[in-house]
Amino acid sequence: MYNLYCTYMTGKRENVLIEALPYIREFHDSVMVIKVGGHAMVDPQVMSDIVQDIVLLRFVGIHPVIVHGGGPEITEKMDRMGKKSEFIGGLRITDDETMEIARMVLVGNINTRIVSLISKHGGKGVGLSGKDGNMILAKKKPTQKILIEDIEHDVDLGWVGDTEIINPEIINIVTANGYIPVISPIAMDSEGNALNINADTVAGDLADALNAKKLILMTDVPGVLRDQTDISTRISRIGVDEVEQLIEDGVLSGGMIPKMRSAKASVEGGVDRVHVIDGSISHSVLLELFTDQGIGTMVYKDTK
């Protein structure tokens, strides 16, 4: 995969452009939802490259919608405040204090930083959260059952939500006027309480509601690996019918579980393809979308 990257960076530039042309034509005027997250968020150069790619998508007639996470930065902030991070099934347990920290990091820090980068690269960004314009209405997740020493326990995840209703009107208005929406995964319940929703899940739900052509989920690994220690075991294509079996087999674990379930739900909901890519690779968005081989894992609907 890294050899592929080097090939494109050192090959003839005109060949790269010619290879990209049919993809640019195919994707023109389509919506693409791009979930930005992982440790790439804390590397300024990688983050700048990602945003530059997204601004380029807008300039060639594609309508990108950014959903961002911020898990590493939330964890770092909690560590500095002496608060322990706890996860169940890849989801952060979110009490009142954790919710306030998450909101501060996601809305007050990361969102504004991405909007500023869009402006730096010549685009126009608008920062939003799921609460704006009643964009994302959610309900609190039910208690989760976990096994501790073979004994089943109920665990309350706190202010963690499941999406109930997506109102895409504000996003459609923003994109129709040439802006790139940047969305924090903070939603609201029927009583006005803020709920933390997994960013991959939000991205998938928005992709469905917006009839997106593509959903791109960024992670810290080169896609789905059968062996987490060996990047040569990357699975380049996964049918939606394979996802639950891969979870059962232990190939998918931790934060990759909600990511791939979101990918599965999106494809089943009508999104053409979902791409899981390593956001730390320079210009990974362009390499995945506009080259024949791609660099990550593609989730598709098996029509057999």
From Swiss-Prot:
Q: Does the keyword Thylakoid apply?
A: no
Tell me what this protein is called.
Acetylglutamate kinase
Family membership: Belongs to the acetylglutamate kinase family. ArgB subfamily.
Keyword tags: Amino-acid biosynthesis, Arginine biosynthesis, ATP-binding, Cytoplasm, Kinase, Nucleotide-binding, Transferase
GO cellular component terms given for this protein: cytoplasm
- The entry's substrate-binding residues are G70, G71, R92, N196
What Pfam family does this protein match (any one)? Answer: AA_kinase
Q: Tell me what organism the protein belongs to.
A: Methanococcoides burtonii (strain DSM 6242 / NBRC 107633 / OCM 468 / ACE-M)
- Look up the record and name the pathway of this protein: Amino-acid biosynthesis; L-arginine biosynthesis; N(2)-acetyl-L-ornithine from L-glutamate: step 2/4
Annotated gene: argB
Described purpose of this protein according to its UniProt entry: Catalyzes the ATP-dependent phosphorylation of N-acetyl-L-glutamate.
